[in-house]
Amino acid sequence: MSLIFDALQRSETERSGTKLPALSAATEVLRLAELHAAAERQSAAQPVSETAQSVDHDKIVAVEELPARAAIRVDGSNVGPINGTGKQQAAFPHFESLKCTIPPENRLVCLSQENTLAAEKFRFLGVTLKGLQRERQLKRVLITSTIPQEGKSMVATNLACTLGRTTQQKILLVEGDVRRPSLSDLFGAEKVAGLCECLLGERDLRKSVYHLVEPGIWFLPAGAVPKNPLELLQSATLSAMMNQLSSWFDWIIIDSPPVMPLADTSILARLADGILMVVRQGVTEKRHLERGLEAIDAKKLIGSVLNGSRRRTAADYYYAEPPS
């Protein structure tokens, strides 16, 4: 996390022309998530300070800029298609396909620019998450940011598509930003009913999830923007819905609203196993990041994505140089 704070400080220095004081190490709360996970694997008698010695604190992926509700309704068959192991996938229903016409100007690098550094960064992020999944309960991953325009939706979409193309697992992308839904536009897909209609009891859950064939994932869109989004998300139906979805899918990637100034994210975060914070160099201010981190359960923070990074590594030059 220290690298992200360093990057933000450099950006603010460039904008203001003055050198800002460095942040205290106490602000690096993302480290607590890894410390907590490591501590659970150690003996209760072992001091936390010893455990900290074996933890890699800077797992950062730099991505180039780029009233009461009705009970949840689920119907249909409990027998699904054949999975990658040749065995029948139990309790996985058939979902309607939704046609995508992905615009050429899209930023879905994992689909249209697979050989670029940005796409490789998302593959690295996927590998990292799969490694964490072997160590702890990690199926529902919430992607958020501190403020709008930091790239959280693009990160969520690219991550879901990357997992869908690199694994035999079933990946669901949930559009949790019900106030400002945008994912259908990213995929060039028709705007259809989804999460909100299901929470209102107007639509069956199985008919609210769609299969996006080309990306190889499933998609639960936000649906029509509700009049009372916060009340809708607070419904107990949402928890029941997430439990049902978890029984069907191997990964659930949730595109959440920004942490500030809405309460929506705190509701969705309670249902997530892990949280990824997206930070955009040149846009995010350190004070906003500090406040955003304070609003999230540190035990669920599994890492961060630095978007629009200008920091170059040896791998960057490998992808930048044309083959000789």
Which role fits each region the language model picked out?
Residues 2-324:
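P-loop NTP-binding module
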